[in-house]
């Protein structure tokens, strides 16, 4: 499980969140909700070791995440879906996916899982729609079989239909060995997860 123990984050004198204690279990999906500026993205980044908390601890399977080697944590454990995709725009879909897994059969299988056929392999990222690029991001993460899947406003730049399909894919990744945590303010997203956590109430 993932445990947040008395977690606090401050920027200068501004308190982003304070004394947060939470438990996340595998085989469940979670949404961190709250209005813009409430700190949900900062909390998500702390769980993903992208921002260090001011105080408190985060453990993954009883191990402090900051005690795990940085390369090991990001390579083996963390999968992150950003609103801006975090892909190499001028490289092809295949090039982006081969960075993490060079097995063509696995690449094709994962692309199908996210709703893209083989014709997209030679397309460059900048040629894709927002929804298609987001699918490639998720495909790349699936190829690495990540344990902790974090998504920060993954539908923010997408139309309702595409956004719903992206959430379908993310929720389909929930398993006995996987954590799926989504930061969102969209009720169409958080109404579909197993547990909603309002960060303003912590």
Q: What do the PLM-derived regions correspond to, one by one?
A:
Residues 104-120:
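Conserved ABC ATPase "signature" region
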Residues 65-79, 175:
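ABC ATPase NBD coupling module
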Residues 149-152:
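Catalytic Walker B motif of ABC-type/P-loop ATPase nucleotide-binding domains
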Residues 2, 17-19:
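Conserved structural motif at the start of ABC-family nucleotide-binding domains
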Residues 56-66:
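Conserved ABC transporter NBD signature motif
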Residues 48:
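Helix-to-loop junction immediately C-terminal to a conserved catalytic motif
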Residues 124-128, 132-134:
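Conserved ABC ATPase signature
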């Amino acid at each position: 499980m993932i445990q947040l123990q008395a977690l606090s984050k401050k920027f200068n004198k501004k308190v982003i969140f304070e004394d947060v204690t939470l438990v996340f279990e595998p085989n469940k999906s979670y949404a961190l909700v709250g209005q813009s500026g409430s700190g949900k993205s900062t909390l998500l980044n702390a769980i993903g070791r992208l921002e260090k908390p001011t105080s408190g601890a985060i453990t993954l399977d009883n191990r402090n995440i900051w005690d795990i080697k940085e390369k090991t944590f990001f390579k083996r454990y963390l999968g992150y879906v950003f609103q801006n995709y975090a892909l190499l725009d001028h490289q092809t879909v295949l090039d982006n996916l081969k960075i993490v897994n060079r097995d063509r059969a696995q690449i094709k299988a994962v692309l199908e899982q996210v709703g893209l056929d083989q014709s997209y392999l030679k397309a460059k990222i900048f040629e894709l729609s927002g929804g298609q690029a987001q699918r490639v991001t998720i495909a790349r993460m699936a190829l690495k079989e990540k344990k902790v899947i974090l998504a920060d406003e993954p539908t923010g730049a997408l139309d309702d239909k595409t956004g719903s399909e992206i959430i379908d894919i993310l929720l389909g990744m929930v398993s006995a060995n996987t954590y799926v945590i989504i930061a969102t303010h969209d009720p169409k997203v958080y109404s579909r997860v197993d547990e909603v956590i309002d960060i303003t109430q912590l």
